Swiss-Prot record:
Reversibly catalyzes the transfer of the carbamoyl group from carbamoyl phosphate (CP) to the N(epsilon) atom of ornithine (ORN) to produce L-citrulline. This is Ornithine carbamoyltransferase. GO terms for cellular component: cytoplasm; intracellular membrane-bounded organelle. L-ornithine binds at residues 160, 224, 228-229. It is found in: Cytoplasm. The lineage of its organism: Bacteria, Pseudomonadati, Campylobacterota, Epsilonproteobacteria, Campylobacterales. SUPFAM superfamilies: Aspartate/ornithine carbamoyltransferase. It comes from Campylobacter fetus subsp. fetus (strain 82-40).
């Protein structure tokens, strides 16, 4: 059985296979030709963290695949009242066909995968956001980027998105420049994994605290909010610490001609990205948001097909 907890669990060909499947599924959806790949299956959707895009895309996605989504907030189930994760996993695994969880701790996802007996998908954790990366990669591929030779600049907080970009780059082999302020760097354990993967993929990983150097000549520029869920008390300090990291017109002018800009949303204009840059690249950003639906449908179908491996 295969789970989808982090891109580090997949090899290059598996990532590309899921993206190819996503393109096929998207083409079917655009022609209103919905194929019931997961007919009568139930997806349990555990939400410790609230979300717009994750809930809508998974709930619509499983419906379009012929199944049903079951929304479970931490207030609705015993997991939010102190029940061990492994007990929740063993109960759900006897009643549903697949689990998607959007949680704080990556270890909770690993526990669900270990004890549930059904495929588990990471809808987001504090460490990784792999379904968002699949959406980003799908979007860039549709925009004509070569996923193995492109140059990507990530500017901002060293968070779950940064970690996921490092996993993607180190598996596929593209160049990734990561610019974070001092004190907000990528965890060393994540860098160690990425560097080890890069011995095979030959990915060029550049870590810096200079956002302009990172963006210079980049084919793709991406960022994320400076204040993630649960960090609201740090907002004022973070805004001060991230001074000089706003992706504005001056910053984008350093990138390659016709460079793309992505943002996983929600975006806070005037902070991590300027209003002008956001609106100039709104088509790319909202295609990226839509592609959460198609990429995640592909992930669910892939997990189902790998159920007995």
């Amino acid at each position: 059985m295969r789970h989808f907890l982090t891109l580090n669990d997949l090899d290059k060909n598996e990532i590309l296979d899921i993206l190819s499947l996503a393109k096929d599924i998207k083409k079917e959806a655009k022609s209103r030709n919905y194929i019931s790949y997961l007919k009568d299956q139930t997806l349990a959707m555990i939400f410790e963290k609230s979300s717009t895009r994750t809930r809508v895309s998974f709930e619509v996605g499983i419906h379009q695949l012929g199944g049903k989504g079951l929304f479970l907030s931490s207030r609705d189930i015993q997991l939010g009242r102190g029940e061990p994760v492994k007990d929740t996993a063993r109960v759900l695994g006897r009643m549903v066909d697949m689990i998607m969880a959007r949680v704080y701790k990556q270890s909770d996802l690993e526990e669900l995968a270990k004890f549930s007996g059904v495929p588990v998908i990471n809808g987001l954790s504090d460490d990784f956001h792999p379904v968002q990366l699949m959406s980003d990669l799908l979007t860039l591929s549709e925009l004509g980027l070569n996923l193995q030779t492109m140059k990507v600049a990530y500017v901002g907080d060293g968070n779950n998105m940064t970690n996921s970009w490092l996993m993607a780059a180190s598996k596929l082999g593209f160049e990734l420049r990561v610019a974070t302020p001092k004190g907000y760097e990528v965890p060393q354990w994540v860098l160690d994994i990425a560097k080890q993967n890069s011995k095979i993929s030959c990915a060029n990983l550049i870590i810096t605290d200079n956002p302009k150097a990172a963006i210079s000549g980049a084919d793709v520029v991406t960022t994320d909010t400076w204040v993630s869920m649960g960090q609201e008390d740090e907002k004022e300090k973070r805004i001060n610490d991230f001074a000089g990291y706003c992706v504005d017109d001056d910053m984008m002018s350093l990138a390659a001609k016709d460079a793309k800009f992505l943002h996983c949303l929600p975006a806070y204009r005037g902070y991590e990205v300027s209003e002008a840059v956001f609106e100039a690249h709104a088509g790319e950003i909202f295609s990226e948001a839509e592609n959460r639906l198609h990429a995640q449908k592909a992930v669910m179908v892939w997990c189902d097909r790998k159920r007995y491996e």
